[in-house]
Amino acid sequence: MKETDREAVATAVQRVAGMLQRPDQLDKVEQYRRREARKKASVEARLKAAIQSQLDGVRTGLSQLHNALNDVKDIQQSLADVSKDWRQSINTIESLKDVKDAVVRHSQLAAAVENLKNIFSVPEIVRETQDLIEHGELLQAHRKLMDLECSRDGLMYEQYRMDSGNTRDMTLIHSYFGSTQGLSDELAKQLWMVLQRSLVTVRRDPTLLVSVVRIIEREEKIDRRILDRKKQTGFVPPGRPKNWKEKMFTILDRTVTTRIEGTQADTRESDRMWLVRHLEIIRKYVLDDLIVAKNLLAQCFPPHYEIFRSLLRTYHQALSARMQDLAAEDLEANEIVSLLTWVLNTYTSVEMMGNAELAPEVDVALLEPLLSADVVSALLDTYMSTLTSNIIAWLRKALETDKKDWMKETEPEADQDGYYQTTLPAIVFQMFEQNLQVAAQISEDLKTKVLVLCLQQMNSFLSRYKEEAQLYRDEHLRDRQHPHCYVQYMVAVVNNCQTFKESIVSLKRKYLKHEAEEGVSLSQPSMDGVLDAIAKEGCGSLLEEVFLDLEQHLNELMTKKWLLGSNAVDIICVTVEDYFNDFAKIKKPYRKRMIAEAHRRAVQEYLRAVMQKRISFRSAEERKDGAERMVREAEQLRFLFRKLASGFGEEMDSYCDTIVAVAEVIKLTDPSLLYLEVSTLVSKYPDIRDDHIGALLAMRGDASRDMKQTIIETLEQGPAQASPDYVPIFKDIVVPSLNVAKLLK
């Protein structure tokens, strides 16, 4: 207490010090004192009230404890009295055993009396029930069946209570009601028949389906009641529990499975489209069934059955099993496509599970895949393998068909622009297009894979196409009279190359929508180079045909006959122009190159004739006439090829300038200026060789041996450098060795 007092005093001093920190606060001392007095009185009042409340609670608790003690003593006394009375009445209870047995027997007899009417009328009730079942009066039949079962179960239960070990009486009762189980089974068959046709019945006679569901629900309640009694007594009547609700769902599951499997009406042998037809029937049946189940069937079942959800799950599982069975079969490529398209796309589309009439109960995002990823992958691998083989076979067949067309006696068809073509590009890319459209139905990834496959096989196909074009040319060269339309079909082969290039670009643009996909495609071997090579060889073969016809006239050049007035160049120009009338059927990119090559080749053949030393001029007059003739003929060739190249926007005159430059060397009258003129010629045409110069000087006929030697040796000391864009023209001209040996003589 002293410690507490000291703490109180210290606290009070501290509070007073806090109140009186300024001089002006001294005037308020009395005010502070009254306020603190009021606070003290208030605290003391609250403290007294709390203590009083605690005291009242303690007083009440003590009173209740005292009453409880008195009650315990009274109960203890009562228990002692009961125990005493029980000990005194043991003998009396044992003497009442006969009374107890009589009570049990009375209970059994009362049950027998209560069911007496039913017992005597069992045969009649059985007949009535049988008739009701046969006439489809299922509710009334079930009511009578319940009466029979109730009588039987009541008697058996009383017998069980009296003497559970007496099997003889139990068997007697069971035998007497033996027809009951048969009626139950017969009724169940009728119920299952209705349930098997529930989707049809609900449209025609929904009342019948409701009756079936009511019967099943009654049986479920009876099952639950009997199972509850079993926990207390251990007694279960025969045939219980029936579990008809569980059997109902089993029947529905089996019905769905049978319905889906039964939709296959055809086989591959009877109908090539059997799978497409089978899947379409499944789609239609399942969609119709689920719509009926959602809108009609669900109204015939209690909500807690969740019949639509159950049927949806059953249909999904049955479909998954059916799709797995189909996937396990040895399917063809088109059948794999049909199956995967249906499984991956159709199933979740608005044509089936995504149908608006099934929403919102059916959410396609929550549906499990019908086929596992491994099965889908295996099917895709099989499809790609089969497709590869098919594409190779299709391309081979298309090429064989095109080769047969090359041998025809009639010209190939022309496109809308008048260019010759064959059906090969259209056939090939129509096939590619069809397969890509099919792959796109399955997935974007498969579409890309199929496109890459098509491009790969196209690359291999073009190599074979090139080989066949070469064989076609070789066969023609062995007998130039056959095939009859060789030129026209070779033109078509060249045009096909341009068509192939355009079709490849179109195919990529249509089926590659992303740069990443473009990268995948471009990683394949480029086909432009192969196609250009085929076109180049084709154009070369056509030019070879031209120059084979010109060979006789080219051999007249630089001969005595030519110098005296041969019309060889006139014939050459007419022949070239005539051929290029046919070559007008070649598409522009290749025709332009072909004209340039023909121009170069014509000039080159003309120069080759110069280098053959077929003639040696004997006088300045002859050299002048020969040179002027060369210039005129160069102009003829220039005019011809300008005419052929009109419309391409490019001049191609430089080749003919070579003939004019050579003519200038021939025409020169002062031999002392030969070195300067030849030097100019060499500077313009760096690919000219010393044997070319020797042949040219030999053709002049006035250059001495020393002059030839000096000119050739001087030029060899400082060969000219060719410009990057220079196209060699002398490089391929070979001077016969005989002439070379005579050059310096």
From Swiss-Prot:
> Keywords on this record?
Acetylation, Cell projection, Cytoplasm, Exocytosis, Golgi apparatus, Protein transport, Transport
How far does the signal peptide extend, from start to end residue? none
InterPro entries membership: EXOC3/Sec6, EXOC3/Sec6_C
Q: Which GO terms describe its molecular function?
A: SNARE binding
Primary localization:
cytoplasm
Biological process according to GO: exocyst localization; exocytosis; protein transport
Compartment(s): Cytoplasm; Cytoplasm, Perinuclear region; Cell projection, Growth cone; Cell projection, Neuron projection
Q: Name one GO cellular component term.
A: exocyst
Residues that the record marks as modified (N6-acetyllysine) are 28
What family, per the record? Belongs to the SEC6 family.
What this chain does, per the entry, is described as: Component of the exocyst complex involved in the docking of exocytic vesicles with fusion sites on the plasma membrane.
Q: Which proteins does it associate with, and in what oligomeric form?
A: The exocyst complex is composed of EXOC1, EXOC2, EXOC3, EXOC4, EXOC5, EXOC6, EXOC7 and EXOC8. Interacts with EXOC3L1. Interacts with BIRC6/bruce. Interacts with MYRIP. Interacts with SLC6A9.
Q: What is this protein called?
A: Exocyst complex component 3
Gene this protein is translated from: EXOC3
